[in-house]
């Protein structure tokens, strides 16, 4: 089923400007409280100016341009401005340091970078060492160092006309973006995303939460992440809704922002839900218009019930990853929801549970979650310049191996168990890290938790728990292990406990387990 036709991203924005004109398209709130608003017409003009800026700097179809930015209007301008001239965006996680950022520059072949003053010093060194193809840097800040190969993004953009000057032939099969995976277990891989992928993501995600043009979709997820781009931004724009992009998440400010912008849809990860729950109760907890909270793994039933009861919301579960572009398994609009199920396969997808020999398993049996889509259309096209890694996860007929374990029931509802790499082998038993974390998270003194497997000469692996306590709390090893023994099988009880002030997380809130082993 082809629901895109020939509508690439350039055509999308020209159409949106014509149809929605002066309707608010984008609201950006900075960490300092500065708010910028753009209508669909104004946003398309800013995108055109940005496309013209890149063209004047020598960027042509197929060239790669890296963005190292926090959530800001310039990210949106660049994303679609590059797409309009057939160039390719390479977003870089704004939390990455020099070595990681340089690695992405080298492996993406980016020749130009858009960033801000806070990140400039490390890129200045990278540019001077000449170890990458980077030849020019645009800074979004007003203050500009007097260095060769550095320009003011805003100054150059404002000099450009509001109509597009360079419009090469485009196809929906053209690459729009190379998004490097978070790399929680290994070096990140460049996920190739096409114009078709992004257009499909918009329609699909809008369907998933029944988005209308009078909706307001607010997100605090980072713009360099697939969730913000494909579940939130593309959905909102495709439906003609208003997209609210908040620069950084604050548990104290979140509900006030939802009220101020009259948000009807938002998205949350477990870290957000847990930090929102530890805020002091307020009479304004339910003073919002949210009808759906898009939710991504993983939360215990007790935590879910407490959150929904306190804030008067319901969670719409969505399961996916960078390679699937969208939440390919999830709750459906107006359909029943079956917690803790992650939902059912969405339209245009097939889903199966397979064993270690790649054979489909019946209902109730645990195996790998596999998804069938169309590469370059409903799932990613390939890993950039990495055919070996592509072949490892993507079969010729479109079946994608997720690396996640789960099972399904007789009605087609799927249940997530864990990442395969997060299964601990203990004395012949398979132990799910997620299962243990959900149990331990119910302890009233514990705010955050992760368990990992560590080498054990007798039992293959031992289990170690890292916990963050609620403010002012203390927890003895005796109390912790007694709680575990009362709530889980003996072979699942951790052998070690470490109390920490925080846990290492990536941009999407996922624990970076390799930093704890």
From Swiss-Prot:
Q: Name one GO biological process term.
A: fatty acid metabolic process
Cite the GO molecular-function annotations of the record: carnitine-CoA ligase activity; crotonobetaine-CoA ligase activity; medium-chain fatty acid-CoA ligase activity
**Coiled coil where?**
none
What reaction does this catalyse?
4-(trimethylamino)butanoate + ATP + CoA = 4-(trimethylamino)butanoyl-CoA + AMP + diphosphate; crotonobetaine + ATP + CoA = crotonobetainyl-CoA + AMP + diphosphate; (R)-carnitine + ATP + CoA = (R)-carnitinyl-CoA + AMP + diphosphate
Keyword Ligase on entry: yes
Top-rank EC class of the record's enzyme: ligase
EC numbers on record: 6.2.1.48
Q: Which pathway does the database say it acts in?
A: Amine and polyamine metabolism; carnitine metabolism
Q: Which keywords, in A-to-Z order, does the entry hold? A: Ligase
User: What highest taxon heads this organism's lineage?
Assistant: Bacteria
Under the heading CDD domains, the entry gives: FACL_DitJ_like (cd05934)
* Cross-referenced Pfam families: AMP-binding, AMP-binding_C
Task performed by this protein: Catalyzes the transfer of CoA to carnitine, generating the initial carnitinyl-CoA needed for the CaiB reaction cycle. Also has activity toward crotonobetaine and gamma-butyrobetaine.
User: Into which family does the record put it?
Assistant: Belongs to the ATP-dependent AMP-binding enzyme family.
Q: HAMAP family recorded for this chain?
A: CaiC (MF_01524)
Name by which UniProt lists this protein: Crotonobetaine/carnitine--CoA ligase
Q: What organism, scientifically named, is this protein from?
A: Shigella flexneri
What would be the name of the gene that encodes this protein? Answer: caiC
């Amino acid at each position: 089923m082809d629901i895109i036709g020939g509508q690439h991203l350039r055509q999308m924005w020209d159409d949106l400007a014509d149809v929605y004109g002066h309707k608010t398209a984008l609201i950006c709130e900075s960490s300092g409280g500065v708010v910028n608003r753009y209508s669909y017409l104004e946003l398309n003009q800013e995108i055109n100016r940005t496309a013209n800026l890149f063209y004047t700097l020598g960027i042509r179809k197929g060239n790669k341009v890296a963005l190292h930015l926090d959530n800001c209007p310039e990210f949106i301008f660049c994303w679609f401005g590059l797409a309009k001239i057939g160039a390719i965006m390479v977003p870089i996680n704004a939390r990455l340091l020099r070595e990681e950022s340089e690695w992405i520059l080298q492996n993406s072949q980016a020749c130009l970078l858009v960033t801000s003053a806070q990140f400039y010093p490390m890129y200045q060194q990278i540019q001077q060492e000449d170890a990458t193809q980077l030849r020019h840097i645009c800074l979004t800040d007003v203050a500009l160092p007097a260095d060769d190969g550095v320009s003011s993004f805003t100054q150059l953009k404002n000099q450009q006309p509001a109509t597009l000057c360079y419009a090469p032939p485009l196809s929906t099969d053209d690459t729009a973006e190379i998004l490097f995976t978070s790399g929680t277990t290994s070096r990140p891989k460049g996920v190739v995303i096409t114009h078709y992928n992004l257009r499909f993501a918009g329609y699909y995600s809008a369907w998933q939460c029944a988005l209308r043009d009078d909706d307001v979709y607010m997100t605090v997820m980072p713009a360099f992440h697939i969730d913000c781009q494909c579940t939130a931004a593309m959905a909102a724009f495709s439906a003609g809704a208003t997209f609210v992009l908040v620069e950084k998440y604050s548990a104290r400010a979140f509900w006030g922002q939802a009220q101020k912008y009259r948000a009807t849809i938002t998205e949350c990860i477990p870290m957000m839900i847990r930090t929102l729950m530890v805020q002091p109760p307020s009479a304004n907890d339910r003073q919002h218009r949210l009808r759906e909270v898009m939710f991504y793994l993983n939360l215990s039933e007790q935590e879910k019930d407490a959150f929904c009861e306190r804030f008067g919301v319901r969670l719409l579960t969505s399961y996916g990853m960078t390679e699937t572009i969208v939440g390919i398994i999830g709750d459906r609009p107006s359909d029943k929801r079956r917690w803790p199920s992650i939902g059912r396969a969405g339209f245009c997808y097939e889903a199966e549970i397979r064993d270690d020999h790649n054979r489909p398993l019946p209902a109730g049996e645990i195996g790998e979650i596999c998804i069938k889509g169309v590469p370059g259309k409903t799932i990613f096209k390939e890993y950039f310049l990495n055919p070996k890694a592509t072949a490892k996860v993507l079969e010729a007929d479109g079946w994608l191996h997720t690396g996640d374990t789960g099972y399904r029931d007789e009605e087609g509802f799927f249940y997530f168990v864990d990442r395969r790499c997060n299964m601990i082998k203990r004395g012949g038993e398979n132990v799910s890290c997620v299962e243990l974390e959900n149990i331990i998270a119910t302890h009233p003194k514990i705010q955050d938790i992760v368990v990992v497997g560590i080498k054990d000469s007798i039992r293959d692996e031992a289990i170690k728990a890292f916990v963050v306590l609620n403010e002012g709390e203390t927890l003895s090893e005796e109390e912790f292990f007694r709680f575990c023994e009362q709530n889980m099988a003996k072979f699942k009880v951790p052998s070690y406990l470490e109390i920490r002030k925080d846990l290492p997380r990536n941009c999407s809130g996922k624990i970076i387990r390799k930093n704890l082993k």
